[in-house]
Regions:
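Adenosine-phosphate binding glycine-rich loop
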Residues: 10, 114-156
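A structured beta-alpha segment of the ubiquitous adenosine-cofactor-binding alpha/beta core
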Residues: 61-67
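Short glycine-rich, flexible loops that bind phosphorylated cofactors or substrates
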Residues: 66, 82-84
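ADP-ribose/adenylate-binding Rossmann-like module
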Residues: 73-77, 84-109
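Short beta-strand and adjoining strand-loop segment in the mid-core
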Residues: 40, 71-80, 119-128
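Hydrophobic, well-ordered beta-alpha structural blocks that scaffold small-molecule cofactor pockets
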Residues: 1-53, 58-61
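A short, aliphatic-rich alpha-helical micro-motif
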Residues: 11, 67-69
Length: 156
């Protein structure tokens, strides 16, 4: 298997489709805030938090292949592995797909992100251990602003 290559993407005016409406789909959608992406959620139902996101379009339906035909980035984020695999199989080779139920089937992974002013740090286990990534992000979040402040004083 090849190693993952880290990137920062400009998603302004890009189409992002999230298939699923639960907590994981919500986390993916909330991470897209302020990106300028056109975010569409495909799911018969969505969690209450998702309903509060003003930048999403919700299509209240089950997944069909046509739902992702124009997508640049796709999250298969349902609680049903078979549906997630249907999404993966329906995608074209040029589309980037994240299968939340099986990282080995994903063409990209969303890292943990820490933002402070104009600085961004991402943390990843290349999809192998998302819960560890989350714990590491939580630990580093409190340290990061102090570190930036300290380094900026010594590198002026």
């Amino acid at each position: 298997m090849y190693n993952m290559y880290p990137l920062m993407l400009n998603l302004n005016k890009k189409v992002v489709v999230i298939v699923g409406g639960g907590k994981i789909a919500y986390r993916k959608a909330s991470g897209l805030k302020d990106t300028g992406a056109f975010v569409t959620i495909i799911s018969p139902e969505i969690c209450e938090e998702m309903k509060e996101l003003p930048y999403i379009t919700w299509k209240q339906k089950t997944f069909s292949n046509d739902d992702i035909k124009d997508a640049h980035l796709i999250y298969a984020a349902t609680n049903q592995h078979a549906v997630n695999m249907m999404v993966k199989q329906a995608a074209h080779d040029f589309q980037w797909v994240n299968v939340v139920s099986d990282g080995t089937k994903s063409s990209f992974h969303t890292p943990g992100v820490i933002r402070h002013d104009e600085y961004i740090v991402t943390i990843s286990t290349s999809g192998k251990n998302p819960s560890y990534t989350k714990r590491l992000k939580q630990a580093l979040t409190s340290i990061f602003p102090k570190l930036i402040k300290k380094l900026s004083r010594t590198h002026k």
